[in-house]
Regions:
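Tandem CBS (Cystathionine beta-synthase) repeat/Bateman regulatory domains
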Residues: 1-159
Length: 159
């Protein structure tokens, strides 16, 4: 369809490559994760294992929750735990040959989607921001290149 073609025109810009995405290793101490998360603009970042395989996500709230008990804040607690102790593990991921409809559906509830190869190796992320840029491009270009006409009552019944 014309809409899908226009959306996918900028497809090469959708993937932020792994080397440009902040991440932490699952065995890193939480103190390291806190440092990395405080330096990046993402609320969550990917967690990888030694083989660069995607294993989960971690956010600043996951780290901060471990620092608090009922009466105080203990920064030393961050050295007692690893990223693996608090990371989110049931995270939707997509393969390198992803489907646009699936990506759009998943990005409703996530600001980005991890992209992995067949061996779960982390390849990068597709962000909601990049998809919205493509939607904006499509909205501006659709009527420049295509005649958009309303369907008749009869044509609408066919759907």
């Amino acid at each position: 369809t014309a809409v899908k073609e226009l959306l996918l025109e900028k497809q090469e810009t959708f993937l932020v490559p792994a080397e440009n995405v902040a991440n932490v290793m699952c065995l890193n101490p939480l103190s390291h994760a806190a440092l990395v998360l405080s330096q990046v603009r993402y609320s969550k970042i990917p967690v990888l294992d030694k083989g660069d395989r995607f294993v989960g996500l971690i956010g600043l709230t996951d780290v901060v929750d471990k620092m608090f008990d009922l009466t105080s804040v203990d920064f030393e607690k961050l050295n007692e735990f690893t990223v693996a102790d608090v990371m989110e593990v049931n995270v939707p991921v997509i393969g390198e040959s992803w489907d646009l409809e699936e990506v759009l559906h998943l990005l409703v509830d996530a600001s980005f989607l991890p992209v992995v190869d067949d061996n779960q190796r982390f390849k990068g992320i597709i962000t909601r921001k990049e998809i919205l840029k493509a939607v904006n491009h499509m909205a501006h270009e659709l009527e420049k290149h295509h005649l958009v006409l309303p369907k008749s009552e009869e044509e609408m019944k066919v759907i």
